[in-house]
Amino acid sequence: MAYITKELLEEFTGKFPEAETELPAVYAGAAADAVARYLHYDPELKEYAVELWGDGTDSIVLPAPVSSVLSVSVNGCAQEPGGWEWKKNYLSHRLANGQLEIFPSGVRLKVSFMGGFDPVPGKIVTTALQLAALYWESAGGNIAVASTSFADTGTRVFNNFREDRFLEQINEWRIYHV
């Protein structure tokens, strides 16, 4: 199930179109896509299966934050489930002696894991809703610049509605890929 829906967007904005339209769903989808592009992964919990190569370090960089490790194989040999540790999108293996295992360059690793969040953090959901509401408000207009003139003072105020201003608030969940 999508973490941002047409119904949730309508409730967030307080707008309930009289005619049946799919535009709110389009805005919700576009906002979810923008969030995924910014984070570099879809924040909803899902299963991943990846093949990676060791690089001489003690951690493997995965494409999404790890929720649980389902299986790991090294050079085709299944590994015991114990000892695997993760922080954000980094996976490590702690040996019985307490040391972290080094994954030599050229070692082939296959990792199956659950990545993302269930539920999606509220700040990510709110950011997606803010973007979707912005798309809805700006329909047929220019979302880059809106201005207001004050007749008495001759002052003009410009508001810049770049997506980045909203997306910056979810930076703590952003990951950078290999």
What are the residue ranges of the model-derived segments?
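Divalent metal-cofactor coordination and adjacent catalytic microenvironments
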Residues: 1-178
